Structure formats: C-alpha cells, structure tokens
C-alpha cells in the first residue's frame, strides 16, 4: 500500500488526436478520429509533446503521472479489482476492451467515468506513466509518493486497451514497454503539478 501526499490534477480523458495535432502538427494514430485517444506514440514522443505544451503555456506543470498517482486516480477510493468494484460483468459500462471495442479505439468519455469523474481508466488505450519499470520495486519502495526506480530499460504502462480481455483491463496490472515502442493500443493522459 502506498499513499500520495502531494496534490495533483489528472486529465479527465486520455489525450485526444485533436489535442495532439494542435501541439505536434501531425497525427500518428492508426484509428483516426478527432476525439479518439491519440495512439501509436512512444514514451519519448509523449515527452516531446509535454515539452512543447509546457513551452506553449510558459510553464513547467504538465507531465505524465507517476505509476502510484495513476493507480490512486484509477481506483478513486475503491479497493476492488476495477475502479467500480469486482463485478467483471460491469466492465462494458466503463471500458472499451476486446469484447465490445470492434477491434479499435473509440472517442474518449463515451463510457461511464469512475467515482472521481475520470474516463477510460480501464481500456480504450493503455497509458504511459512516468516511472521506469522495476519488477520488485514496490516490495521495498517508499510507502509515500513512490516514483519508481531511478533507471531502467522499460517504462510502465497501465490500464489495458481496446484489444485486452477483461482479465487485463484492471486497476492493478503493470506492463513494461521500451520507451521507443509505438503501438495502436498505447496512448497517455496528462497530469499537472499544483506547485
């Protein structure tokens, strides 16, 4: 169990293709739609998006969430398998996954939000987080505001995607992906520091 002591904002939705194009000028996504989540972006691509967004805004507040922040926000106070409890039968109300996606992404915020008003925390696209992946990191990590290992070869993605089955579109599973990988089920959402 970990705790988050520093307040932060997390975007209600995954970054859309329209938002990506406004900053980057082109759309790398396989499944086109202005309000669909941008996908087919690497962790490195996302860092460049964040750099440009912060420069445009004249700030340094936008970033990826840490893995701990992401799970805290996904769960929204729940201790269940999913943000809404343990009933897999309810997943289609909250998530685009392999049983209902038609093998593609969908516009953000078309499924029910979690208790804190965050959409698509399960499914649609997996989401990059800031942390390096460490298989045993959480067995000895700080219990308050863990930030992942100091280095590594892979980054963490969370949340599952449109092509995952219900057993992988959960609140807790962690997946490791090299930071240069692009995939049509992989996107992100922004966090914003408050200080």
Residues of each region from the PLM?
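Structured loops at beta-to-helix junctions and adjacent beta-edge loops in soluble globular domains
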Residues: 13, 41, 85, 97, ...
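Short, hydrophobic secondary-structure boundary micro-motifs
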Residues: 30-33, 82-84, 140-141
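Surface-exposed recognition segments
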Residues: 1-3, 78-79, 101-104, 121-195
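Residue-level signal for well-ordered alpha-helical positions
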Residues: 23-26, 76, 85, 97, ...
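Short aromatic-cysteine micro-motif
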Residues: 1-78, 99-119, 194-195
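Short, solvent-exposed turn/loop segments enriched in Gly/Ser/Thr/Pro and often Arg
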Residues: 39, 68-71, 87-88, 158-161
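Chymotrypsin/trypsin-fold serine protease catalytic domain
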Residues: 79-105
